[in-house]
């Protein structure tokens, strides 16, 4: 979620992050999520998912001339498999999907975002 990725961005000096936006009402998470438009499928998409992090990753890498090997992707669901596979570093975070785990470079099973810190340094 953006509340976590923005914290990591600020702490480690990333240029930017893209993630689902967790909605809050009166400082309490509602459970609703906004999906960035860069995730949405279009005629250039390389996968069949309606929304996919790979769409955003390819778009951003192309726009800023970044090699895919210099990217890090965190995912937990089937719709993340194609992006985890293409990223320079793919992380399965608390996934119950064996395919996600099988394509990831790193697997984190404990729901603890602190486990990500050594991987982004």
Identify the residue ranges that each predicted region occupies.
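C-terminal cap/substrate-recognition subdomain and adjoining C-terminal extension
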Residues: 1-121
